[in-house]
Amino acid sequence: GSRGLGDVYKRQITDTPTSLVSNLKNIGYTCVAMHPYYDTGWSRNIVYPNMGFDETHFIDDFDQTKILRDYITDQELYEKIVDRYESKKSNEDLFIMSISMQNHGGYTEKYDNFDEKVRLLGLNYPDVNQYLSLVHESDSALEYLISYFQNVDDPVEIVFFGDHQPSLSSSFYPNLNGKGLSGLTEDELEDLYTIPFFIWTNYESTEVELPITSINYLSTLALERAGIELPAYNQFLADMMETIPAINSRGYYSKSAGGFLHIEEATGEEADWIRNYNILQYNNMFDKKEKSEVFFPYLK
């Protein structure tokens, strides 16, 4: 039978893999995970401690009157981040990973507790209106979060990204790309899966616009921007980024081709990088006996 993704997540993360969490713990950070929903989702109550998080905060740790539709608001989540920052010891370095719930799909039900403020002009897509109205609320909450940390004395870095685009009425997509969801080129398909991100600091740092990247590189970009020396694995990723600026399970951005290719279409130096990346990922996740202590040192 088939196994759910959550099952794989729980089965494979049974001891502490090398990750941003283990790397930051090794240099003295307290690592905190926050998710304003049930702790059993994706077995987070098991997986997060296995990843090395020192603290986990789930739905019972939040004010459950701060609800939009059926979910705790981004504003409440950000206030909890601020609370945890304000309660930290004076010499405590904090890494807080937060996964929000406010804008989770679907978007077709009507709610008494949500006044939708954004409407498409000339198009009747209630689900799109609801989604855009939720994003509007997220913008306000994000303004609160950044304004708060703009004014603290400690250096702070915020890495902000979504995990996927919303699932909306299929009949809406021709208005976006002129084609809908079928017959798309690899580049057009990748566009549908592309999400925005930013890294913000409350200290002076050079503004850089990355035309394209992928989530596997965000921890490396965050460490670089924070001025933290890159562990060997992140240095590998920083070097790989020069040749393969974006990669996911479907394909990768090929500089030589000037667009997205399927993984199996890679040749030459691009194929070498992808092959070595596969070897390192396997070594970190599955190779219990021969794990490279250079790339994947155990938690000290």
What are these regions (language model features)?
Residues 2-300:
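Solvent-exposed soluble domains appended to multi-pass membrane proteins
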